[in-house]
Amino acid sequence: MVPQVLLFVPLLVFSMCFGKFPIYTIPDKLGPWSPIDIHHLSCPNNLVVEDEGCTNLSGFSYMELKVGYISAIKVNGFTCTGVVTEAETYTNFVGYVTTTFKRKHFRPTPDACRAAYNWKMAGDPRYEESLHNPYPDYHWLRTVKTTKESLVIISPSVADLDPYDKSLHSRVFPSGKCSGITISSTYCSTNHDYTIWMPENPRLGTSCDIFTNSRGKRASKGGKTCGFVDERGLYKSLKGACKLKLCGVLGLRLMDGTWVAMQTSDETKWCPPDQLVNLHDFRSDEIEHLVVEELVKKREECLDALESIMATKSVSFRRLSHLRKLVPGFGKAYTIFNKTLMEADAHYKSVRTWNEIIPSKGCLRVGGRCHPHVNGVFFNGIILGPDGHVLIPEMQSSLLQQHMELLESSVIPLMHPLADPSTVFKDGDEAEDFVEVHLPDVHKQISGVDLGLPSWGKYVLVSAGVLVVLMLTIFIMTCCGRVHRPKSTQHGLGGTGRKVSVTSQSGKVISSWESYKSGGETRL
């Protein structure tokens, strides 16, 4: 938004010059001339456009854009990122503990983010604690996982508000734009699925602080409002106005680009989608005051001329030029034909350039055609010079015209924020690198017995264990077989039913070989 503030000083606002300020007014409709006495002469009220007979003025209040330079409508916000911190510990056979930290992300909920932000703003001491990693627990020969879910708040994160559709513009949004802020949806998605953007103030409308209340006078006829006199004293017509919302506030965009919010009973059409309004700045406001002062000065000059006419009982073309209405609308036109003072009802329109009313030498265009003169005299002090050129007294006075040109040059449209990206995105305009964390519950998970080996190592260990068990089994079976073999032999011999006995050298009978062996050994 290239906001600079709208001030619309339309002295001839409602004229069909579409934003151009007039340098002169001339009748586009001129009634029949009738003779009058000098006492019927009067000075027009140039501060009110007496169009359509709306001469009833009543005080009222209206809302307009604030005066002051607005480079952009800034909305302070913050980003909220969901982070899961995982601490994994393993304790081996001898009690050695290994800890590994990992981080993952998750998409946070708006309510949790708002609560975390409120903690931060309130200076809750739990924030300092929540910045730490989860405290790791451990168990012998086991892997223990401890996790914490944290909400990382980064602020400030500033976005630009478009007053026309209340959309937000920032680099953090997908495609640079967010249109989802409503009463039911109070956040914007960002370029990351696990990060959302939220305004610091849940009521987004409070960020659009660009309006001010003013007092003026409503011009109406019956129940119809034709226009109003603004707080600075200038009349603004509602002819050609259309309805337009700014920051969700319904108002009227006038022909000169002014935006006002006021109650009217007339049915007004909506403005086209691409219709913009002008800004209101101090410079334009100052020029508008100068224009009002100039109009007041012109009225004083008119009263002086009228007083001179009454005192001298004489009228000149130059004095009659002071009685011309300076703003569009209904008024009077005066002239002198054959030494007779004449008056006619007229409806004045604005003129942008002198060529509009003097297209060629000797031609004064009124109502689309060259107006006839009477002995070189037109009206309102306009005469035909000796060289055949049309002479208008106001062509010699350009002060009011200069004010209007200055005013016109100061009117700047209230544009969309991305119309000039350089005014929105500046180098180094990034959020400060500080983080506040909101950590809810801590989750702990304990695994089964873990020897700390990789998956292939576990298979090797199991295979080796099986092999060792098999070898031990074979060894035990072998040993047991050797121990039981002699008993098996003895049992076999007894099974034959034969008994072997021998006689020793001493003549003693030995019943068996074992007895003999033991007896022999004993004697030995």
From Swiss-Prot:
<keyword id="KW-1133">Transmembrane helix</keyword>
<keyword id="KW-1015">Disulfide bond</keyword>
<feature type="topological domain" description="Intravirion">
    <location>
        <begin position="481"/>
        <end position="524"/>
    </location>
</feature>
<feature type="disulfide bond">
    <location>
        <begin position="43"/>
        <end position="302"/>
    </location>
</feature>
<feature type="transmembrane region" description="Helical">
    <location>
        <begin position="460"/>
        <end position="480"/>
    </location>
</feature>
<keyword id="KW-0472">Membrane</keyword>
<feature type="disulfide bond">
    <location>
        <begin position="178"/>
        <end position="188"/>
    </location>
</feature>
<dbReference type="InterPro" id="IPR055447">
    <property type="entry name" value="Rhabdo_glycop_CD"/>
</dbReference>
<feature type="disulfide bond">
    <location>
        <begin position="80"/>
        <end position="113"/>
    </location>
</feature>
<feature type="disulfide bond">
    <location>
        <begin position="242"/>
        <end position="271"/>
    </location>
</feature>
<feature type="disulfide bond">
    <location>
        <begin position="54"/>
        <end position="226"/>
    </location>
</feature>
<feature type="glycosylation site" description="N-linked (GlcNAc...) asparagine; by host">
    <location>
        <position position="338"/>
    </location>
</feature>
<feature type="glycosylation site" description="N-linked (GlcNAc...) asparagine; by host">
    <location>
        <position position="56"/>
    </location>
</feature>
<dbReference type="GO" id="GO:0019031">
    <property type="term" value="C:viral envelope"/>
</dbReference>
<keyword id="KW-0261">Viral envelope protein</keyword>
<dbReference type="GO" id="GO:0039654">
    <property type="term" value="P:fusion of virus membrane with host endosome membrane"/>
</dbReference>
<feature type="disulfide bond">
    <location>
        <begin position="208"/>
        <end position="247"/>
    </location>
</feature>
<keyword id="KW-0325">Glycoprotein</keyword>
<keyword id="KW-0732">Signal</keyword>
<comment type="subunit">
    <text>Homotrimer. Interacts with matrix protein. Interacts with host TRFC. Interacts with host BST2; this interaction inhibits viral budding by tethering new virions to the cell surface. Interacts with ITGB1. Interacts with host GRM2.</text>
</comment>
<comment type="similarity">
    <text>Belongs to the lyssavirus glycoprotein family.</text>
</comment>
<dbReference type="Pfam" id="PF24834">
    <property type="entry name" value="PH_Rhabdo_glycop"/>
</dbReference>
<keyword id="KW-0946">Virion</keyword>
<feature type="disulfide bond">
    <location>
        <begin position="363"/>
        <end position="370"/>
    </location>
</feature>
<keyword id="KW-0812">Transmembrane</keyword>
<dbReference type="GO" id="GO:0016020">
    <property type="term" value="C:membrane"/>
</dbReference>
<protein>
    <recommendedName>
        <fullName>Glycoprotein</fullName>
    </recommendedName>
</protein>
<keyword id="KW-0449">Lipoprotein</keyword>
<keyword id="KW-0564">Palmitate</keyword>
<dbReference type="InterPro" id="IPR001903">
    <property type="entry name" value="Rhabdo_glycop_FD"/>
</dbReference>
<dbReference type="GO" id="GO:0098670">
    <property type="term" value="P:entry receptor-mediated virion attachment to host cell"/>
</dbReference>
<dbReference type="Pfam" id="PF00974">
    <property type="entry name" value="Rhabdo_glycop_FD"/>
</dbReference>
<feature type="topological domain" description="Virion surface">
    <location>
        <begin position="20"/>
        <end position="459"/>
    </location>
</feature>
<dbReference type="GO" id="GO:0036338">
    <property type="term" value="C:viral membrane"/>
</dbReference>
<dbReference type="InterPro" id="IPR055448">
    <property type="entry name" value="PH_Rhabdo_glycop"/>
</dbReference>
<dbReference type="GO" id="GO:0055036">
    <property type="term" value="C:virion membrane"/>
</dbReference>
<feature type="signal peptide">
    <location>
        <begin position="1"/>
        <end position="19"/>
    </location>
</feature>
<comment type="function">
    <text>Attaches the virus to host cellular receptor, inducing endocytosis of the virion by using different host proteins including TFRC, GRM2 and ITGB1. In the endosome, the acidic pH induces conformational changes in the glycoprotein trimer, which trigger fusion between virus and cell membrane. There is convincing in vitro evidence that the muscular form of the nicotinic acetylcholine receptor (nAChR), the neuronal cell adhesion molecule (NCAM), and the p75 neurotrophin receptor (p75NTR) bind glycoprotein and thereby facilitate rabies virus entry into cells.</text>
</comment>
<dbReference type="Pfam" id="PF24833">
    <property type="entry name" value="Rhabdo_glycop_CD"/>
</dbReference>
<feature type="lipid moiety-binding region" description="S-palmitoyl cysteine; by host">
    <location>
        <position position="480"/>
    </location>
</feature>
